[in-house]
From Swiss-Prot:
Entry GO terms, CC: iron-sulfur cluster transfer complex
PANTHER family associated with the record: IRON-SULFUR CLUSTER CO-CHAPERONE PROTEIN HSCB
Keyword match Oxidoreductase: no
The protein's name: Co-chaperone protein HscB homolog
SUPFAM superfamilies in the record: Chaperone J-domain, HSC20 (HSCB), C-terminal oligomerisation domain
A biological process term (GO) from this entry: protein folding
Keyword Cell inner membrane: no
Similarity field: Belongs to the HscB family.
Keywords, in A-Z order: Chaperone
Quaternary structure, from the entry: Interacts with HscA and stimulates its ATPase activity.
Residue ranges occupied by any J domain in the UniProt entry: 5-77
Domain of life, per lineage: Bacteria
GO function term, MF aspect, one: ATPase activator activity
Amino acid sequence: MAADDYFSLFGLPSKFAIDAQALEEAWRLVAARVHPDRYATASAAERRVAMQWAARANEAYRLLRDPMLRARYLCESAGIDLQTESNTAMAPAFLMQQMEWREMLDDARHDERARAALGEELEQAREAMRASLAELIDTRQDYAAAGQKVREWMFIEKLAQELAAVQP
């Protein structure tokens, strides 16, 4: 079994907008083919290779089923260094949105309606990111712009985690 990337491992096109059901079916087929139990009577080397392929299939499935991780993977595969640790530059409009969301998060600590409103806004932002990334990656192949969107989405996910940690 050979696969250059996670998409080809499952026989899927390398794109952002993927068919989730096709991904799951492909993963099940690959996982069944390389499951270590199938190699119980094989040599130690063959069992080790089967375990490595099973781990690779599981990691590929975990990454590809998450839209943000899939977008990040596609950008990095196209040679874009997201510099997630060092590059904090964002578009001015997104910076303003961040400030507004931070204020809403502060309010959410004491107000159930504010919590619900922020949760709804973040979900809408996620949907907008999905649509934008499908356009940037699948249609325009503008991986640099997509990389910027992925960094913005990472902020949204971090904020969503902070919101989830807010106690009612």
